[in-house]
A protein has these predicted regions:
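Metal-dependent nuclease catalytic regions and adjoining charged, substrate-binding loops involved
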Residues: 159-161, 171, 175-286
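Metal-dependent nuclease catalytic cores that hydrolyze phosphodiester bonds in DNA/RNA
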Residues: 1-136, 143-154, 159
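Alpha-helical structural elements
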Residues: 7, 38, 47, 62-63, ...
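Residue-level recognition of conserved beta-strand positions in structured domain cores
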Residues: 139-141, 185
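Generic hydrophobic secondary-structure signal
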Residues: 66-68, 97, 101, 169, ...
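Long, contiguous hydrophobic alpha-helical segments, chiefly transmembrane helices and signal peptides
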Residues: 137-139, 171
Length: 286
């Protein structure tokens, strides 16, 4: 375990499984209020499109994606209807997780007012999830794949952080004058949870990146942050290039790469080859 609170939380949940736990009415009401607020926010906000602006929740993203959000938001891929339930699952997980922390006797603080980070271009605001032992933590719900791979450690998260989670945490910590803690991650597939500490985070470097992002967005200059990757088969390059992993979840990937072709893997010999996003194809057959 990576955090002292994990043991206390596991003990409380074990008692709950065995019918030995209790929960206060205050905690039940707090969970209910948090979920109610989430339902109102997700389903009752009317138009979801808001005027673009840098926030703690987006400033860690690649600048090419932010450029599209600012200049061509209409070109984003439409969200599937499952998106709403997925967002609600995350909100419910966070609400219940905080309730479990409370009942497990783990002291924490919540952010009731937005914190502000001063950058060269102005101020960026946001609201962090919680603080334990003087360190800012974020609560994330993740798919089984992300739980096992992306959130395996700080290093794996930092290496493929297309959602900007590391920069976001650094921004919250800097703005609040607290330490950067890490991420409480809950697996949406099976309920497993763990703590991923940001033990190798370079705060000065991350805040400098946020400042650079703000300057780039203000200059309104478009430049791709990721290059196509060389496709390989059995350890050898095929001569083709494919979409960079950093672009896979971007809502603007089709606009950014207008010549991209999605088709079954060219070199694969499987009966049902996986679908690959090709940027350039120089060899049709292997």
């Amino acid at each position: 375990m990576n955090h002292p609170a994990e043991l206390a939380l596991h003990k409380y949940l074990a008692d709950a499984v065995n019918g030995k736990s209790t929960i206060s009415e205050a905690t039940i009401e707090r969970i209910g209020k948090d979920v109610t607020d989430a339902v109102r926010r997700q389903f009752g906000s009317g138009s979801k499109r808001k005027e673009f602006g840098l926030r703690m929740s987006n400033i860690g993203k690649p600048t090419c994606q932010l450029w599209f959000e600012k200049n061509k938001p209409e070109e984003a891929l439409p969200k599937p209807t499952t998106f709403m339930f997925n967002m609600m699952l995350g909100d419910i997980v966070e609400a219940v997780f905080k309730g479990a922390l409370t009942e497990a006797g783990i002291a924490f603080e919540e952010c009731h007012e937005p914190v502000s980070l001063k950058l060269d271009t102005g101020t960026v605001k946001g609201t962090y999830d919680l603080v334990i032992d003087g360190a800012v933590d974020d609560v994330k719900s993740a798919s089984d794949w992300s739980y096992r791979n992306k959130f395996e450690s700080f290093d794996t998260l930092h290496k493929g952080d297309s959602f900007g989670y590391v920069g976001q945490l650094a921004g919250y910590a800097k703005a609040s004058g607290k330490k950067a803690g890490g991420w409480w991650v809950v697996n949406k597939a099976n309920g497993a949870f763990k703590y991923v500490p940001a033990n190798n985070i370079n705060m000065d470097e991350e805040v400098a990146k946020l400042n650079s992002t703000a300057l780039t967005v203000e200059a309104n200059e478009f430049k791709r942050c990721f290059k196509p990757e060389i496709e390989t088969f059995r350890g050898h390059p095929t001569g083709n290039t494919v979409l960079n992993n950093g672009c896979i979840f971007c809502d603007f990937r089709y606009s950014c790469w207008p010549n991209m072709v999605e088709r079954p893997s060219i070199p694969s010999q499987a009966k049902e080859p996986k679908i690959v996003s090709y940027i350039t194809i120089s060899r049709e057959h292997m």
